Amino acid sequence: MSCLPALDKFLQNYHQAYLTSLGELPRYYPQGEASVCIQGEFHADLDQAVSWQPVKREVEGSFANVEHALELTLWPEINHFYGQYFSAPLLFDSEWGTGELLQVWNEDDFTCLQQNLIGHLMMKKKLKQPPTWFIGLLDEGDKMLTINNSDGSVWIELPGEIPTQQLSPSLAEFIGALSPRIAPPVKHEELPMPALEHPGIFASFKRMWQNLFGKR
């Protein structure tokens, strides 16, 4: 079962929750990066939050280059989850705690995602661990949310370790169990990255990379 209907519904509920509770669209710190998601004026030189809404991509994002580079077939849900929309990260509440789903802010952000996905999968191979790919963060970024690439199940993963706690048998069911979390925009601290630097999708994910590479 594709996760796309669940993602579509969550995005609709997400923006409706902000409009109902705050009377405004959600806001996000783009840190100088333009996006078709931005509503209203945008000044790249001003460090301020912008109102945004998701925009369906005209051409679906592809991970064929990642698969070719790693000689690995990725679980097809990755195309539905990351390749359909431009969007800011999505905050959520759940029975497992608070967290955020990563999304792609613009085309450069998508390239950054691919580069860091390659880095993550190469690290899993180096550690002789089964391949996973990340979809978000849990508990203020202390834990990664990852997909088991062999069956599409959703797990909690700590940097450098094999996932031990399964949350859902599928990404669709996992997204369906989440509730939008209403919160003010937070400007994330910039931390060093092992691959391409980009302030969009990995503003918060950088904390995970710092922990991972600090251990090795």
Curated annotation (Swiss-Prot):
Keyword Cell membrane belongs to the record: yes
Primary subcellular site in the record, as a coarse category: membrane
Presence of keyword Cell membrane: yes
Cross-referenced InterPro entries: Syd (IPR009948), Syd_sf (IPR038228)
UniProt KW keywords: Cell inner membrane, Cell membrane, Membrane
Subcellular location, record wording: Cell inner membrane
Topology with respect to the bilayer: Peripheral membrane protein
A single Gene Ontology CC term: cytoplasmic side of plasma membrane
Known function: Interacts with the SecY protein in vivo. May bind preferentially to an uncomplexed state of SecY, thus functioning either as a chelating agent for excess SecY in the cell or as a regulatory factor that negatively controls the translocase function.
Family of this protein: Belongs to the Syd family.
Protein name according to UniProt: Protein Syd
Taxonomic lineage: Bacteria, Pseudomonadati, Pseudomonadota, Gammaproteobacteria, Alteromonadales
